[in-house]
Design a protein with these regions (language model features):
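N-terminal secretory signal peptides that target proteins for export/translocation
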Residues: 1-5
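Bacterial N-terminal signal peptides
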Residues: 6-21
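Noncatalytic, solvent-exposed loop/strand surfaces
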Residues: 21-451
């Protein structure tokens, strides 16, 4: 495998007539949904209103196709993409396919690429080609070969491509190490999407597939495999989560067969059954509880669980029950299919793919309000919600971001349109919102107030 650093021409548009504002120390967004599960630090310059030109600091065209989310470290915005030699693959479209999607293996040569974009200017510093080949695996029309979000520790960036491998690069674009992964079969040929997670010098990777699923840990500095455990699971698309609770640190993995917790050396701690047949949302923690959702739209069982720390063995619910010693509460039908829910303040907010929004008490599961339609004309939602400045934001597949009021009353406060499809969850860095659409990366921020 050869590695090449390629410099290309890019389109960068600076939208402030006064020029790009000087950067101060950035608050990093190092992984999918940031450090705090979608909750960003407040900043008066974080935007609540925008369109394709309003409050846009810059836009940068990103070649190829990728639905991985952007991540931010200092002045570096990292995204991944896969660039095809010819534009012959079926185009994704917003909304639900209901079995009408095309699943194909491309016959064109592809390049798997990591991009480093300057947060201050929007210019691409470098792009690193990690692989050039014909794709060996099919994918769903709506998926991409670059749907796994990278992760960074502020020194290195780690990129995972399903069926290709795991790569570590420094901030100059040099490949420090790589681990090739064998081709595996994903359910219905839909491709992969589970992102890696980084914790105290270790990278954790889950690869649930229809051949042999596994979870593994790698040394972040050297790439050495520390351990690998096979899993009795079929294909899932949920990323792992390291839960640091008041008793221990544990690696949480969800699956359509079981939710499993491992210690950080790969020993199984506890597990439970009772998920939908496809699992996508990422686990996260708040208020001392672990939140797990699994909501495949075709299933009757679409559960959300709140788990207490300290469990061991099988903690599956008995038939007809919703709680036990370690399940603080559960609900059988409130989970989303793609988006990961959000806990802000006392409430668990759930964005459903078909454009409904719900709120429940995060500690008890009590319904605050049931399904509320966000907009009658929205095509669907895949991106996960985020919050700052006491406003919740949800991004539709059409590229429309709806601004919602948090609290006990549902209210839509505004709508911001970029006019292009997106599935990626945005990043937030200090005073800026970073949104990835099908072809572009946007930095959006309120102008600095005149002194």
């Amino acid at each position: 495998m050869s590695f090449r650093l390629c410099l290309i021409g890019v389109v960068v548009t600076v939208a402030y007539s006064v020029g790009v504002p000087a950067l101060t120390v950035a608050i990093d967004w190092p992984q999918f949904r940031g450090r705090d599960a979608g909750v960003a630090a407040n900043n008066p310059r974080l935007p609540s209103a925008w369109d394709s030109t309003r409050n846009v600091v810059w836009t940068t065209e990103i070649p190829g196709v990728g639905w991985s989310s952007p991540i931010v470290s200092g002045d570096h915005v990292f995204v991944t993409s896969v660039v095809a030699a010819s534009d012959t693959d079926p185009k994704p479209k917003p909304g639900f396919y209901n079995g009408g999607a095309v699943t194909t293996t491309s016959t064109a040569e592809h390049r798997w690429v990591v991009y480093d974009v300057a947060l201050a200017t929007g210019k691409i510093r470098w792009q690193r080609e990690l692989r050039r080949a014909l794709p060996q695996l099919p994918k769903h029309q709506k998926n991409s070969y670059a749907s796994e979000t990278p992760v960074t520790d502020g020194t290195r960036v780690y990129a995972l491509f399903g069926g290709v491998g795991l790569f570590a690069l420094n901030f100059e674009g040099q490949v420090l190490w790589s681990k090739e992964f064998a081709d595996v079969k994903f359910r219905n040929g839909w491709g992969g999407a589970a992102s890696p997670v980084l914790h105290r010098g270790r990278l954790y990777v889950v690869c649930d597939n229809d051949d042999q699923s596994f979870v593994a840990a790698f040394d972040a500095e050297t790439g050495r495999e520390l351990w690998k455990v096979n899993r009795k699971e079929g294909t899932n698309w949920s990323s792992p989560f390291v839960w640091e609770n008041d008793q221990r640190s544990e690696l949480i993995t969800t699956g359509s067969d079981k939710v499993r917790s491992y210690d950080l050396n790969g020993t199984l701690l506890w597990e439970f059954a009772g998920m939908s047949t496809i699992t996508i949302p990422t686990p996260f923690a708040r208020h001392g509880l672990l939140f797990i959702s699994s909501g495949y739209v075709a299933d009757q069982l679409r559960p959300t669980y709140a788990i207490k720390p300290g469990a061991s063995g099988d903690i599956s619910l008995a038939p007809g029950t919703t709680t036990n010693a370690y399940v603080a509460w559960s609900h059988p039908t409130i989970a989303p299919y793609n988006p990961t829910p959000l806990v802000y303040g006392d409430y668990l907010y759930t964005l459903l793919d078909r454009g409904f929004f719900t709120a429940h008490d995060a500690r008890t599961g009590r319904e605050i309000y049931g399904r509320q339609r966000i907009a009658p004309d929205a095509s669907g939602f895949t991106s996960s919600p985020w919050v700052y400045n006491d406003k919740i934001f949800v991004l539709s597949e059409d590229g429309d971001t709806y601004v919602l009021q948090p609290g006990s009353e549902f209210k839509v406060l505004g709508k911001n349109s970029l006019g292009e499809m997106t599935l990626a969850t945005p990043a937030v860095s200090e005073d800026s919102l970073i949104i990835r659409t099908a072809s572009k990366l946007y930095r959006i921020s309120e102008p600095e107030s005149p002194r």
